[in-house]
């Protein structure tokens, strides 16, 4: 091998090394960005997974077969993986410091969404797919979701609507409001009011420690419904045609019902005591409704009638 040939081969080898080594580095730089503005084909039913340390997340469903992603971060990086089958965005701090992040994503209806923020609000609307959303400090709104729906916030208001599927909602110190729900519902707070309206479900559980619980919805004759609070009122507004067995208990409050109550002799003596415990049937019975509070009132209204005193 002459000198010229050997030099050529070494040059080619060096070029190959230069070409191959930076490739993953370039890919890494492509993933780690401070700003993203991209539109690309995206399959219906695919996943979106977004996680930020501080900032707002907005995800919206639309009818186009594509995704539009806009993201920016003041300090730090956005680790992004964008494909026709999955969108993954995760923020990383710069030397332990991370600025506010803003993420806006448009996806086809039917996309499944996971979103989390340590400090910031989350809004997911019109995706009509599975949703899992959580925030340590921030309000969350979810409108139009199906299948499995899980939404939790530690310190912030939670609002959800147009839910179709198995729904789990929870807050620690924020109010919880949900309406237009079809499917099983579990809702819980520590110090936030719970309001569930327009519910069509055979299984509902709503529990809080120091706030009121309100339920406006249907009663399935074969269903079960549980409502409890320690220091708030329980207000149920159910159809006049409901068929249910009610089990109501309050220690220092009162029980009020718009439905006729027939008490047995033993029940009359129980009502005379300081604590009040009542069991009665409306319609032909069937569904099991349990409501309890320690220092609040229990109010049972017919659907469409909300003029009974709650204080």
Task: Label every PLM stretch briefly.
Residues 1-311:
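Intrinsically disordered, low-complexity terminal regions
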